Amino acid sequence: MGTVRSRRLWWPLPLLLLLLRGPAGARAQEDDDGDYEELVLALRSEEDGLAEAPQHGATATFHRCAKDPWRLPGTYVVVLKEETQRSQPERTARRLQAQAARRGYLIKLLHVFHDLLPGFLVKMSRDLLELALRLPHVDYIEEDSYVFAQSIPWNLERITPARYRADEYQPPNGGSLVEVYLLDTSIQSGHREIEGRVMVTDFESVPEEDGTRFHRQASKCDSHGTHLAGVVSGRDAGVAKGASLRSLRVLNCQGKGTVSSTLIGLEFIRKNQLVQPVGPLVVLLPLAGGYSRVLNAACQRLAKAGVVLVAAAGNFRDDACLYSPASAPEVITVGATNAQDQPVTLGTLGTNFGRCVDLFAPGEDIIGASSDCSTCFVSRSGTSQAAAHVAGIAAMMLSAEPELTLAELRQRLIHFSAKDVINEAWFPEDQRVLTPNLVAALPPSTHGAGWQLFCRTVWSAHSGPTRMATAMARCAPDEELLSCSSFSRSGKRRGERIKAQGGRRVCLAHNAFGGEGVYAIARCCLLPQANCSVHTAPPAGAGMGTRVHCHHQGHVLTGCSSHWEVEDLGTHKPSVLRPRVQPDQCMGHSGASTHASCCHAPGLECKVKEHGLPAPQEQVTVACEEGWTLTGCSALPGTSHVLGAYAVDDTCVVRSRDVSTTGNTSEQAVAAVAICCRSRHLAQASQELQ
């Protein structure tokens, strides 16, 4: 795979030291800075006093980028288990160095992580991977890989709500209470657009540029970062004109960086946050590389510390879940649209899409600061520009409500977006139902959102077609899982259920025999002071429907689901509501376990809406009225031809097979049933604040 295999040298350590001290030994090293010599000298005491670990099989796992040209063999991030002590990374690194030296290998320790995640970055032969994976405390090892900048004035008008548009862009505030960290190339901080608004930190961690003839012209090295800084907070073309920026250089003059450099940059931010806590922080990640477990884990750690991370979805016209940091659930991932609200096309490529994208934003022909001169402007395109727009909007939202959590901010961004404006035909057919049809916009005002019950739909990864395959969707830690549904393109599924896992509730969907796979779909809501539970009824006797309702007084029904434990063809009727009989009851097939999701929260009230047509339809929908939020979606009555039910914003969608091939009769027509809820408590509290 492009890696040079090192020769095994079984020389005594003193002889190895003499060779390293000589000129020939120095020339043989990959680095010429003398660090290897100091390393081996330091290992004498380690080798004398440290017994080698028993040769057990490796329990840790190894990960590398799926795209071979992006890989960096020879550099590895070693991640330790979470419960390890703060001093453990250094101790484990020394142990690895000592054991490698006994085998005739040298390891260069490049960085030790403490504040972001426990681990270290090393340069070593791939021959040592098996040894490293067997070390105690090691959770996994990831090979380093490249990340890339994602760039290839209608934009300001587009993010302003229509009812507030005027002749010029007039944001509700400038985002002055928020600090935005930009991980990018270097920045021309003297440009008139961003002068006095950007602090260029001393952080720099970039790989060498490709090619010996590449000239590091300032205008090339600064171009990407300068443009994005102008989009976020530029005087004339910026979104959040009052936000302050701090730049970290993690991309070289060609717009290329590494996963390890990005990790070190994120740790730099975390260290600053610990040393000098400030107000809300937004981190803009206008870059993308192959899927990286360690980079996603680092984003998760930073998000838990209260930092909002906004990332480019990527410009590869591909599933964003295949790239990092776009695939990290804790990151707000942004795709790119043009002035007509259509997905951006960049030659043969274009914006990424799929379930890992949260929303889209302007990303084509965006005017911003140019590094060619201090008064120059340039037009650029890509998901980097789209992410910069959302970072600016987030800065303004956080300035208006500094106490917003990541979950609350994400829900507001989704709620206030322009909906159903993107032509879904641009996306691959299998991605259309997974990709959000949302274009970012500012909220209509800085107040008045507190009364709203916010919910979003979270899709799982595809389960795969194996016989007993399952899919799992989960909400963010600050969100409540109010309902669970499933979807299968073949229609063969064994239903879904809510299950407790690791102290949290998750939505599980089950594939059926002969099925092509299934998706789990979670409805995740912000419901303060909620007390939620799931009540289950086992399968009823033959010919009898299974019924279940909320047992506790004051609890209301927010969703229904059911599943079959025994193997079948997935043709049983799914759980359904009978709103005309008992609106707080779920009813399912006699062979299925039926589950009622019930919640109690101050002022929470829910109702059921049903919509059906007398003739079979491939899709039936029912929507909640304004002021009500969809929490549950199911089919009524449900037949073998139902593919599944899912929520799109506040609309319940029930999909069936193509009626031209199924031979449906009018008696088999499917109706959509929505559970719509609102919180009178939140509305009252909002009115009192006003």
Swiss-Prot record:
Residues 1-28 form the signal peptide. Keywords: Apoptosis, Autocatalytic cleavage, Calcium, Cholesterol metabolism, Cytoplasm, Disulfide bond, Endoplasmic reticulum, Endosome, Glycoprotein, Golgi apparatus, Hydrolase, Lipid metabolism, Lysosome, Phosphoprotein, Protease, Secreted, Serine protease, Signal, Steroid metabolism, Sterol metabolism, Sulfation, Zymogen. Its proteolytic activity is autoinhibited by the non-covalent binding of the propeptide to the catalytic domain. Inhibited by EGTA. The modification Sulfotyrosine is found at residue 36. Cleavage by furin and PCSK5 generates a truncated inactive protein that is unable to induce LDLR degradation. Undergoes autocatalytic cleavage in the endoplasmic reticulum to release the propeptide from the N-terminus and the cleavage of the propeptide is strictly required for its maturation and activation. The cleaved propeptide however remains associated with the catalytic domain through non-covalent interactions, preventing potential substrates from accessing its active site. As a result, it is secreted from cells as a propeptide-containing, enzymatically inactive protein. Residues 448-690 are annotated as: C-terminal domain. The modification Phosphoserine is found at residues 45, 686. Its EC number is 3.4.21.-. GO terms for molecular function: apolipoprotein binding; low-density lipoprotein particle binding; serine-type endopeptidase activity; very-low-density lipoprotein particle binding. One of its GO terms (biological process) is regulation of neuron apoptotic process. The active site is at residues 184, 224, 384. It is an enzyme of class 3 (hydrolase). Residues 153-459 form the Peptidase S8 domain. Residues 29-150 form a propeptide. Glycans are attached at residue 531. It is found in: Cytoplasm; Secreted; Endosome; Lysosome. The keyword Lipid metabolism applies. Monomer. Can self-associate to form dimers and higher multimers which may have increased LDLR degrading activity. The precursor protein but not the mature protein may form multimers. Interacts with APOB, VLDLR, LRP8/APOER2 and BACE1. The full-length immature form (pro-PCSK9) interacts with SCNN1A, SCNN1B and SCNN1G. The pro-PCSK9 form (via C-terminal domain) interacts with LDLR. Interacts (via the C-terminal domain) with ANXA2 (via repeat Annexin 1); the interaction inhibits the degradation of LDLR. Crucial player in the regulation of plasma cholesterol homeostasis. Binds to low-density lipid receptor family members: low density lipoprotein receptor (LDLR), very low density lipoprotein receptor (VLDLR), apolipoprotein E receptor (LRP1/APOER) and apolipoprotein receptor 2 (LRP8/APOER2), and promotes their degradation in intracellular acidic compartments. Acts via a non-proteolytic mechanism to enhance the degradation of the hepatic LDLR through a clathrin LDLRAP1/ARH-mediated pathway. The C-terminal domain (CRD) is essential for the LDLR-binding and degrading activities. Belongs to the peptidase S8 family. This is Proprotein convertase subtilisin/kexin type 9. It comes from Ateles geoffroyi. The gene is PCSK9.
